[in-house]
Amino acid sequence: DHGNMFGAIKFYKIAQQYGIKPIIGCEVYVAPESRHQKSSAQGMADASYHLILLAANMEGYKNLIKLVSIGYLEGFYYRPRIDKEVLAQYAHGLIALSSCLKGEIPILLAHGQERRAHEVAATFKDIMGEKGFYLDEIFNNYN
């Protein structure tokens, strides 16, 4: 799900029914700065980046629920958004993936900002811990 976990219970039950261990997660929206900032230069186009969060355990599941709720209650601007500050508070038990082409790191790389992309990756690694942040590799059919 994007920005919510509406499908989590149904997914969990169906996976259990077929003997599959479900991995619960959410592709959250991350505000470029503070989740409290309700403005952007280009409206919805630059109001948030995508980030995939997966619950590694029950603590992570509870933290994911907290983050999604905070996105709606405190960060809503076009979409429910969190920020890196609140992510750091609730990172325990979560694994983060750099996400699709709408993730912060892929966008920076697409604009030739490799140094900034490295800085952002290092920030996520600091927030999520040594084994809590991974870069996605996605075939996107672009040359």
Regions found by a protein language model. Give the residues of each.
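Phosphodiester-processing cores and adjacent nucleic acid-binding clamps
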Residues: 2-143
